[in-house]
Curated annotation (Swiss-Prot):
It comes from the Bacteria. The keyword ATP-binding does not apply. HAMAP family: Ribosomal_uL15. GO terms for molecular function: rRNA binding; structural constituent of ribosome. Keywords: Ribonucleoprotein, Ribosomal protein, RNA-binding, rRNA-binding. NCBIfam families: rplO_bact. Residues 21-31 have a biased composition (Gly residues). GO terms for cellular component: cytosolic large ribosomal subunit. This is Large ribosomal subunit protein uL15. Pfam families: Ribosomal_L27A. Coiled coil: none annotated. InterPro entries: Ribosomal_uL15, Ribosomal_uL15/eL18, Ribosomal_uL15/eL18_sf, Ribosomal_uL15_bac-type, Ribosomal_uL15_CS. It comes from Mannheimia succiniciproducens (strain KCTC 0769BP / MBEL55E). Belongs to the universal ribosomal protein uL15 family.
Length: 144
């Protein structure tokens, strides 16, 4: 076997359809587009969801739900992020100073993810039960 003798398997490659190249090709004249109509024209076609003037499905169905704006100002804090804060006292301001959360965050909750290394004091943040147990097991404390 040589590189210059490599070839695809028989029947693995199909030649491209050459549209509009004579009636003998089977794809001459209209080129597989049929006769007249919007889809036969250059640039022709309808937008997504268009059903020919019938009320489309996405407008027949009712609207539902909403996007909570509270999610944009709330952050989850992992346990291993707590050690990145100076002075081992974790508050909303100290998290912002350590670039763990952005300045537009108004609420934060400490969740049980990762490991807490060393004693830290969490002040003024919401904390899950599991995270509270992990912080206290490491010698830290949670203040309201």
């Amino acid at each position: 076997m040589y590189l210059n003798t490599l070839a695809p398997a028989e029947g693995a490659k199909h030649s491209a359809k050459r549209l509009g190249r004579g009636i003998g090709s089977g794809l001459g004249k209209t080129g597989g587009r049929g006769h007249k109509g919007q889809k036969s024209r250059t640039g022709g076609g309808v937008r997504r969801g268009f059903e020919g003037g019938q009320m489309p499905l996405y407008r027949r169905l009712p609207k539902f739900g909403f996007t909570s704006m509270k999610a944009a100002v709330t952050a989850e804090i992992r346990l291993n992020d707590l050690t990145k804060v100076e002075n081992n006292v974790v508050t909303l301001e100290s998290l912002k100073a350590a670039n763990i959360i952005t300045k537009d965050i108004q609420f934060a909750k400490v969740v049980l993810a990762g490991e807490v290394k060393g004693a830290v004091t969490v002040r003024g943040l919401r904390v899950t039960k599991g995270a509270k147990a992990a912080i206290e097991a490491a010698g830290g404390s949670v203040e309201e």
